[in-house]
Amino acid sequence: MKVSLSAAILVGCVALSGCMSGTMGRAKDAAPPTTVASVDLNKYAGKWYEIARYPNSFQKKCEGVTAEYALRPDGRVGVTNTCATGTSDGKARSAQGVAAVIDGSNNTKLAVNFAPIPLPKGQGNYWVLYLDPNYQTALVGSPNGSYLWLLARTKSISVDQRAALNSAAERNGFRTDLLKDTIQP
């Protein structure tokens, strides 16, 4: 498969996101975010729609964003992130990655890599901060506060579901006023 320069830059930025310091949406002196107690990866696997996110360089002009997770025989999780560029009916592009569960995290912290640039051993950039009991909505963020995503199994969510996600974000020190809603076709 041929990879364009822009796609290579995209996956490189995603891979480095967990290594970069920054606190876009959290106070520098805030305690680390708190993850959920555990995640059943069998239930978590499948397609998720991005409801909102912190703006970031590797998702500029992305709409119609989805993330698909698939369990692999080696115990890791395959990740396919897809977005359309420009508008919700723009040309789709995808990035393929692999996630490894951080030991001792009960599947709540993962190190996700989208390029041959690995994260430092034991460092997770994908923390599950909220997950409703039915695995229909999730809040995922980076421990340094630079990234935050609201995810759902459907293209839209209820006002109550959004309030629960926002509340979980705020409890973890994330600013919800910085969230950008994602257009889903």
Enumerate the predicted regions with their spans.
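Bacterial N-terminal signal peptides that target proteins for export
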Residues: 1-8
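A beta-rich soluble binding module of mature secreted/lumenal proteins
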Residues: 3, 19-185
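Bacterial Sec-type N-terminal signal peptides, specifically the leucine/valine-rich hydrophobic h-region
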Residues: 13-16
